[in-house]
Swiss-Prot record:
It comes from the Bacteria. One of its GO terms (molecular function) is structural constituent of ribosome. It comes from Ehrlichia canis (strain Jake). GO terms for cellular component: cytosolic small ribosomal subunit. Part of the 30S ribosomal subunit. Forms a tight heterodimer with protein bS6. InterPro entries: Ribosomal_bS18, Ribosomal_bS18_sf. This is Small ribosomal subunit protein bS18. Gene3D superfamilies: Ribosomal protein S18 (4.10.640.10).
Amino acid sequence: MLKKNKKANSNNSNATAYSPLAYLKRPYFKRSKACPLEQCPNEDIDYKNKTLLSKFTSEYGRILPSRITSVSSRKQRLLSTAVKRARYLALLPYC
């Protein structure tokens, strides 16, 4: 029969890595909450505006999420429909 290790229940040196203080020391940065499209009211979200749409797509042609671009949810919906229309008309690549 195998004997169970009695030291498994004792305090381990790895237990300090999961302490709440370890999470406080993690570096992070805050993104600006302002929508970049609200700052320029002259910019229209249109499927023909390739330069604007390419700013919000990745290098592989995927639409970037709003948590990365900090675009408001309403503008994100308008961007996604404009990108999809531009893809359909072959103004933007699918991939």
